[in-house]
Amino acid sequence: MPWLVLDPEGGPVEPIRRYLYDFSARNRPGSVRSYAYGLLRWWRWLRAVGVQWDKASPAEVRDLVLWLRAAEKPRNSPRRTSAATAGKFNPITRKRNLGDGYEPRTVRHSNSVVRSFYEFWIEIGEGPLLNPVPLDRRGRRPHAHHNPLEPFRAEGKIRYNPKVPRSRPREIPDEHWKDLFGAMRSNRDRAILALDISCAARASEILGICGVDVDWGDQLVRVRRKGNDAEQWLPASPESFVWLRLYLAELGPLDLNDPVWWTLRRRDHGDGLRRHPMNYDALRAVLRRANKLLGTNYTMHDLRHTAALRMSRDESLSLRDVQTILGHAHLSTTADIYLIEDEAQVIRRVAEHLAEREDRARQPLPPVAVGYEAADLAVLFGGLPR
């Protein structure tokens, strides 16, 4: 087992171990890690309130949700420079910085993990009779009005799930993109950003590229999609391949099966002084240095949003094309996120409308025909036309 939850004596918690053993057979290691941490939080909560795991009720789940919404997340080290901006909006990007508390998505994920854990035990007949994470069905039978021509989807949301504020994806403006790209210190970092903003891949997918995954002739890169590990070739811009060529020339010979991205500095982790494959923490450090220099809070996912919004506004690309590049399973996901009216264009049109009203108000009233009183016409028609 790659991940286990241990009790205070150092032994594995048997109910969680059996669940994770079954869960790992059908999910990725990253999902196993995420669920293990979620169950660790739930187990600690049950110990704090003095309730056995198979005696838990919806009251314990409700109280945990209330506690998560009020508590602060534990940190390995205290905040330093980010303490003053935690939870506040950045004036340049207009994005909110992460706060010290648990976000609604974290609470929803916690509820999903606990519900899945009890569904496993109820299914094999060894757990409680009722799942302590109830669904809110609002008094109607699931799939009561299901269309037989459409696939079945899960009905009923978890009762204590908090609502997630819906926000539109933030695009990096062209002038800010130039500043961000100019803040990169190496050809490696420039190649990563240029590649990501042209092919709209996720950060983990970009970092997983190996030498054999680069098609120099057709200017394609092959990524392994998050969730199902499906391989997909994505087109990238000629500029990104220029920066990639410059970086690889500095790196030296690269085996086709080796990762493309390596650390710039050689470090000794017990096997000699050498370079190591670049991981997500190292990539975050690159953006953290650039954000500190520019006073921004951009992330790698902002580059994916920017590329997707650029594609969605291109009349030569269909929504199906954008869905394929982004790797979304459902076309509705792409449409809900990216098929939106440009906020800047809406603001511009409304500003023009307000300015036009001001101009009309300053224009003199048209002359009234001979034989009619202006006051009488105003009463009759509710004001003279402009």
Give the label of every model feature segment.
Residues 213-216, 279, 296-297, 316-337, ...:
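Short, polar N-cap/turn motifs at the start of nucleic acid-interacting alpha helices
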Residues 127-179, 265-274:
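Flexible interdomain linker/hinge and immediately adjacent N-terminus
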Residues 234, 284-324, 340:
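Short, basic (Lys/Arg/His-rich) helix/loop patches that form interaction surfaces
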Residues 164-166, 170-203, 304:
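Basic, Lys/Arg- and aromatic-enriched nucleic-acid-binding interface segment
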Residues 351-386:
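C-terminal secondary-structure termini that scaffold catalytic or DNA-interacting sites
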Residues 16-31, 40-150, 179:
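N-terminal core-binding DNA-recognition domain of tyrosine recombinases/integrases
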Residues 199, 204, 208-242, 249:
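Conserved tyrosine-mediated DNA breakage-rejoining catalytic core shared by Y-recombinases
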Residues 238-296, 383-386:
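Active-site/catalytic core of tyrosine-dependent DNA strand-transfer enzymes
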